[in-house]
Regions:
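Short amphipathic alpha-helical segments, especially helix-boundary/capping motifs
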Residues: 43-47, 122-123, 139-142, 174, ...
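Generic preference for well-ordered secondary structure
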Residues: 50, 54, 128, 132-134, ...
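Right-handed parallel beta-helix
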Residues: 118-158
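A structural motif detector for beta-strand N-caps
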Residues: 142, 148-150, 154-156, 160-162, ...
Length: 203
């Protein structure tokens, strides 16, 4: 097995990687829709990764591998609970997720002051290790009423509907058409034609 991926990293002013977006992945012949990056001038670092099947079995040791494994789940190249996610929490930095992108917690106060002085809107959506899925991947034939309630690393099959109070964690999701009004916890999957009622939680 051969896995090749191209990612775009976002960093703090001190050079710390905050997150990595992988729009291009070739998973042993299965590919994402994007085949190459547009020829834009950018100050962001472009990351190229080449993995084998053994890398899926290794614990996570850095931000780059953490984000690649989360992308593999949400692109549905791998099933939940099929790859090693040990070390995920320790590898992911806690990040301020805003309408202007990922910002380091150490720098958010400065950014807030800057936004007020320059009359630029800075909307803080969450402070978390995991970003919303839809900041990175738009799954096909899926409805999500509140995108903040589905994390990157969620596995959503076509025909899935997630209502306003539904929640899907990373390494969790649906294996077919489903109506999700409750919570799907990490490590849990629901089968085809499932209906998870409001207020319910699967663990």
């Amino acid at each position: 097995m051969q896995i090749k991926a191209t990612g775009i990293s976002s960093k703090s002013s001190k050079g710390k990687i905050l997150e990595v977006f992988f729009p291009i992945i070739d998973f042993d012949g299965k590919k994402t829709h994007i085949k190459e990056l547009p020829n834009y001038e950018t100050s962001k670092e472009i990351i190229n990764i080449s993995w084998g099947s053994e890398d899926l079995k290794k614990p996570i040791s850095d931000v780059i591998s953490a984000y690649l494994k989360l992308h593999l789940l949400s692109y549905k190249f791998v099933l939940p609970n099929s790859i090693n996610l040990e070390g995920l929490f320790d590898s992911l930095p806690n990040v301020v997720w805003t309408n202007q992108g990922a910002i380091s917690i150490d720098e958010i106060d400065e950014k807030l002051i800057e936004s007020k002085l320059l009359n630029q809107d800075l909307n803080i959506r969450s402070i978390d290790k995991f970003p919303p899925l839809t900041d990175f991947i738009i799954p096909e034939n899926v409805r999500i009423a509140d995108a903040s309630r589905v994390r990157l690393g969620a596995y959503l099959s076509p025909g899935t509907t997630i209502m306003h109070e539904g929640f899907v964690n990373f390494n969790a999701g649906t294996l077919g058409k489903a109506m999700i009004e409750g919570r799907i916890s990490s490590g849990v999957v629901v089968g085809n034609n499932s209906d998870l009622g409001g207020g319910s939680s699967t663990m």
